[in-house]
Amino acid sequence: MASLRLPRANPLAFTRWPVTVITAIVYLALLIPLLVVHHVVPSAPSSPPSGLNISEAWADLQVLTNGFHPYNSRRNDVIHSWLLRRINEILDSTPLEQEYRALDEEKPDVFVFDDVYSNLTTYGGTLKDADLGVYFEGTNVIVYIRGWEDDTEHWWEAPNGVPTSRGGVLVNSHYDSVSTGFGATDDGVGVVTCLQLVKYFTTPGHAPRRGLVVLFNNGEEDFLNGARVYSQHPISKLPHTFLNLEGAGAGGRATLFRSSDFEVTGPYMRSPHPFGSVLSANGFDTGLIASQTDYVIFQGNMGLRGLDVAFMEPRARYHTNQDDTRHTSKDSVWHMLSAAVATTEGLVSDSTDRFDGAPNTDGGVPSGSGSQAVWFDLFGSTFVLFQLHTLFALLVTLLIVGPLTLLFTSIALTKADKMYLFRSSAKSEDRLDVVPLQGLRGFFRFPFLFGIPTVVTVGLAYLVTKVNPYIIHSSAYAVWSMMVAAWVFLAWFVSRVADFARPSAFHRIYTLTWMYVLSWVSAVIATVYANQRGLAGGYFIFFFHAGIFLAKWISYLELFALPSKTEYANQLRSASGRASGHGSRRGTTSGEDDGEEAEEEPTESTSLLGSGQRTTFANYVRVGGDNHAVAEEEVIDPNVYGREQAWSYALPKWTWVLQLLLTAPITLIMVGPLALLTISAISQTGQDGGHPLFAYVAIAIFTTIMLTPLLPFIHRYTYHVPLFLLAVFLGTLIYNLVAFPFSDSNRLKLYYVQEVDLDTGVNSATFAGLSPFVKDVSQELPSAAGQTVSCEWHTKRRNLLSCSWEGIAPQPVEGDHPMKDWVSFNISKSTDKPQARFEVSGLNTRACRILFDTPVKNFHVAGSAYDPRFPYDAAGVNEIRLWSRTWENQWTVDVDWDEGALKGNVVCLWSDHNQPGVLPALDEAIQFLPVWAAVTKGSDGLVEGRRAFEIGNDD
């Protein structure tokens, strides 16, 4: 009977159950916290710091969101007055001077500006519409808390007065909402945060060193007009840095969208719950994110340096009636508030001159320039910040040191005669015998191991996009599950097939070699982009590449544990000599091709004795003198796994754990939050006209990156996890292909506007949205019954279908005024040149437009200010937008054009939907929409009434 040497149980051995269990534990131990951090907002403290009151902030938010309050609504004026009262209440509640002196500080002077004087003409909006001109009158509310290092004079009252102290700090929010949303997170939380900042920095112990300007701007939703007109107020010359508070979702965590530089980002590190990645900033820089915030005005036009902090999901509630307090929480308020307090406190307490220097834009404030930054959070509790040139240096160093280290290690292995890699055979000491090493086995499997799962997941992205493109809107995690399950199962299946056909102890090192090459190339690309384009979003590649390099180096160091190739050949010859006395012949090693197909793959349940030929530790096959003889006593080396190469008995059995810990955790920690953040941001952009394929391919790419660290080990998996994932894949695939893509918690947004020809009384209500859903919804409305709903592709919103029908006539103007009187205009044409003066007004509105069929060369609004920081560089203007702080105001606009007639329309807007019955077509749409659909504004006005004009050559 054969004697067996059974190995001791090793919980870290590179065998099936340890590999399956440990890798599963590592992935789950990291993925679960990442998901929790992404979806669970830290609880607000029961006892907030001195100077802050969360309950008060929540009560303010409820008042602010008790109705729609766009700029062109009566409630907007109510909110404006309420803000002034709240600010005065906060300032009136500040303690006496003695309490400040007890803390060795002076009570700060506070100035409140109700800016109902500033106006401005700008061009292009935020969408780079070259043919657009905008005149806007602001109603901003500005609070200036004087810093104890600031000028004590009222310099802003002097003509052309400028501050002589160091630059101050601006914190901005906007108090207007869209006409279809209550504005809880866009931007109600920002507004109540600013109110709390006024309270905090006027509380004893928090007096600022630098001046603090808190801006409540009005008109952000209509192309950032409030921030633009703020530039005309004298106090705007004081701040050099800023913090912009914004919202593009409903609840959740407030993320750091972007920042201008390393120095200004530093104070954000004080935040107790930092959240965000520089990758989102790169999205804005490269144009992948098209929407904008007031950040671009402060940083791009005014030359300030600052940060953009905003809520960013779920986008389905953004600009709808679900952007309310019901769908946010005190915890979300605290998350933004705590970040704002920490960041602002860091900025106003700065005692250096790093935010003072030459202007970085023409006409900008003298804020100097900063260094480009790399930043990201770790589990929502730690913020990592360093300069971009540091990342560049680290990448270059790793790109050079890594290959050199591996080269020198290879040389050392070669000198020690232990370089088994890529070696097919070895010679004995006397060089008479040649023994097989099979050192190349396993090298060529990685392209299949990596390529097949990746190609299939990308193929799934195309399949779902073709069959059910918007399922990701409501079921992003079903898509994630499908991709992950398919990738893991296919990677395991391919690796098991390869391992069955050609088992190799070098599967790990060769897989890591391929991974190292791919990550090295990725690091080169990241280095080039960081150096030439200033894009820091590839920072995760450095950590990914570093982990793979160390794991690969460990595999190289493992080879030192092997016998020299000559020594191994001598062992085989010695074993052959001992066996020849028994009539044995030299057989194949455990990984030889000959006879592999007939040999059953060893598993945990396979007999150690097996059947047929049996091998010794040196993998020589013992056979009896004849086929009926009893086999000689043999020794089976348990340190050789399955049918892998015999020399692998000497390889360490535990180092794979170290390699796993060097590759998987760092990849998940770096890439996991990016994946969640990115998909949360783009999964619901299909309803806005974005192509859904991008989101699915992004999931496939992130899946591949996060699961690639499994490839060196996955061939050791038991079948249990892969087969379970196969079932998950089949179930989620079917669901993703057939399920309805929208739900009452993830609604499809439909863009609404009603256009009225005031000369004829004919109106057209329009929904713009995804086909075929928008057409189905439009046809089901009672007012559309019996009509032919006309649908055509939207001219401005890409990939959206615009469906129109004759709606119920609106009643935005009280009284019995004829429709054509809703908009009034008078045109006076010059007698000697192509110039004309328009006098325009509208009833119960403060927003109108002049549209031209052919562009005018220039225009001027009477009484308007102009600013070279907002230059006019277009060939002509097709549209002039007019905004007034006064209801039923009359604008006087002079235009000039080339020779010929001038045709167009004068349009006025109505955006107030707080009173039922005023806009009955919209009331009907909201009442009869299915639960999975939501209304959002399709234009600045919910109702747009127009009257045509024509100026002939002889007029």
From Swiss-Prot:
Q: Which cofactor does it need?
A: Zn(2+)
Span-the-membrane segments of this chain are 17-37, 391-411, 443-463, 474-494, 509-529, 534-554, 657-677, 694-714, 722-742
The positions flagged as active site in the entry are 220
Tell me which residues bind Zn(2+) 1. 174, 186, 246
Spell out which residues lie on the membrane's Vacuolar side. Answer: 38-390, 464-473, 530-533, 678-693, 743-955
Signal sequence residues: none
Region of interest: Disordered = 574-611
- In this chain, composition skew of type Low complexity spans 574-590
State its role. May be involved in vacuolar sorting and osmoregulation.
| Protein name per UniProt | Vacuolar membrane protease
Q: Which organism is it from?
A: Aspergillus oryzae (strain ATCC 42149 / RIB 40) (Yellow koji mold)
